[in-house]
């Protein structure tokens, strides 16, 4: 069977991916935004948190915490839940627990993406980023592109050329250039 897809559809798909505001390297395949996102906020005592705020624990475990009931955190560090989807109270805040596989991430800008035509389709090149601080040790498995403002995961790809390479917390790393291709079946 021969198929044909209008080239503007490729543009639409790639344009939706190119609004990404964060790129993350993950130790496992993320299936949602929370598993790939790493917030810049670490839990702090006696702090006002709004609905939807995202934090990590001071020990940087493999979880991310979402404020599901706004309030003020307690004066001492809570017992952070370590079961995905569990909730717990901290002062007057209620947190929901999410698995998190992100080990390093970097902000993305519109000029970090270059869309070009290729034979039978289009591609989106994601530019290289260097000197990115690793915040959690783990092996490289997947790269995710995220729309942070809308809490959406836009694209995930297996990091085949560096799959399994261990990253160590505190070191610097490189996010290599890669291409996202949409090609018509021939």
Residues covered by each model-derived region:
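Short beta-strand elements bearing conserved aromatic residues within extracellular beta-rich modules
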Residues: 65, 142-143
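Tryptophan-rich substrate-binding surfaces of secreted polymer-degrading and adhesive proteins
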Residues: 40-100
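Small cysteine-rich, disulfide-bonded extracellular modules of the LU/uPAR three-finger superfamily
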Residues: 1-39, 100-142, 148-186
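Hydrophobic beta-strand positions
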Residues: 55, 145-146
């Amino acid at each position: 069977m021969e198929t044909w897809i209008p080239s503007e559809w490729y543009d639409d798909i790639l344009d939706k991916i190119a609004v990404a505001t964060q790129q993350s390297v993950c130790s496992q395949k993320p299936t949602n935004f929370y598993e790939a996102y790493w917030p810049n906020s670490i839990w702090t005592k006696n702090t006002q948190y709004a609905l939807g705020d995202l934090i990590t624990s001071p020990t940087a475990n493999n979880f991310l915490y979402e404020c599901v009931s706004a309030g003020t955190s307690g004066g001492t560090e809570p017992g952070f839940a370590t079961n995905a989807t569990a909730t717990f109270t901290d002062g007057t805040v209620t947190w929901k627990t999410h698995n998190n596989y992100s080990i390093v991430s970097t902000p993305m800008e519109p000029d970090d993406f270059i869309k070009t035509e290729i034979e039978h389709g289009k591609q989106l090149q994601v530019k290289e980023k260097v000197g990115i601080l690793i915040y959690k040790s783990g092996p490289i498995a997947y790269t995710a592109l995220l729309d942070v403002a809308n809490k959406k995961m836009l694209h995930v790809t297996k990091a085949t050329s560096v799959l399994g390479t261990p990253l160590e917390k505190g070191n610097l790393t490189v996010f290599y250039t890669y291409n996202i291709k949409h090609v018509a079946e021939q």
